């Protein structure tokens, strides 16, 4: 039985479970009856590691990373990969309008944006084009579909999640971030207030255990 009191952060929690479950499925993606896809713990761990390496190359420790996606396996992979890379996840509702995203981006100044599809990027595109502090944009769906019919100022900013997870891992690669403890920020949640703009609330790794 795992004692979460012995864990320092959410990455350790995942790795602990991944080592036990390994070949078992963690996700079932059901797009339609003839299109089902499963992901094992082992496969998910590798995908987190591959993505985290690319993120780490493009952010500094403590940088915010905006995550705009529906609930899907890649959301989970992205969230953990950001933490492993030393970033702080800023998840955003997919129901936000363009002005909401603009406010969020100006408030938290993310170095990286992860976006799922064309519909979402349409609402983010103007802000991404305007803000130099956004170094990279990673698309969860195939990159050409996500960027279709959009005016991108800098196409070099854009990376494809699906190509990233095709990368090979080195023998010594493993998931860890020894700098994270229970007081370290895990994410910034923007909550809708009764009036005015949403307020960002920092949630720590320890706070997620409670």
Question: Which residue ranges define each predicted feature?
Answer:
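Flexible, non-catalytic linker and terminal segments flanking ANL/adenylate-forming cores
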Residues: 1-12, 31
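Adenylate-forming
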Residues: 14-18, 28, 44, 48, ...
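AMP-dependent adenylate-forming
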Residues: 13-40, 145
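Conserved ATP-dependent adenylate/AMP-binding module captured primarily in the ANL superfamily
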Residues: 96-127
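Conserved AMP-binding/adenylate-forming
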Residues: 37-38, 52-96
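Conserved AMP-binding A3 loop
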Residues: 38-42, 186-210
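Short beta-strand elements of ligand-binding domains
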Residues: 69, 92-93, 134-143
């Amino acid at each position: 039985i795992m004692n979460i009191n012995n864990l320092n952060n959410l990455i350790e929690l995942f790795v602990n479970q991944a080592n036990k479950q390994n070949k078992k499925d963690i996700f079932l993606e059901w797009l339609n009856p003839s299109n089902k896809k499963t992901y094992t713990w082992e496969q998910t761990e590798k995908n987190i590691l591959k993505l985290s390496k690319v993120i780490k190359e493009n952010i500094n420790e403590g940088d915010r990373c905006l995550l705009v996606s529906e609930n899907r396996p890649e959301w989970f992979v992205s969230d953990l990969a950001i933490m492993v890379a030393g970033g702080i996840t800023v998840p955003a509702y997919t129901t936000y309008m363009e002005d909401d995203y603009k406010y969020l981006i100006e408030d938290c100044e993310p170095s990286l944006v992860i976006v799922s599809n064309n519909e979402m990027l349409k609402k983010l595109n103007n802000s991404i084009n305007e803000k130099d502090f956004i170094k990279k944009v990673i698309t969860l769906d195939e990159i050409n579909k996500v960027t279709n019919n959009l005016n991108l100022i800098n196409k070099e900013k854009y990376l494809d999640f699906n190509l990233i997870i095709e990368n090979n891992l080195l023998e010594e690669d493993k998931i860890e971030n020894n700098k994270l403890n229970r007081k370290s920020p895990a994410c910034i949640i923007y909550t809708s207030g009764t009036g005015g703009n949403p307020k960002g609330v920092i949630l720590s790794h320890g706070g997620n255990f409670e």
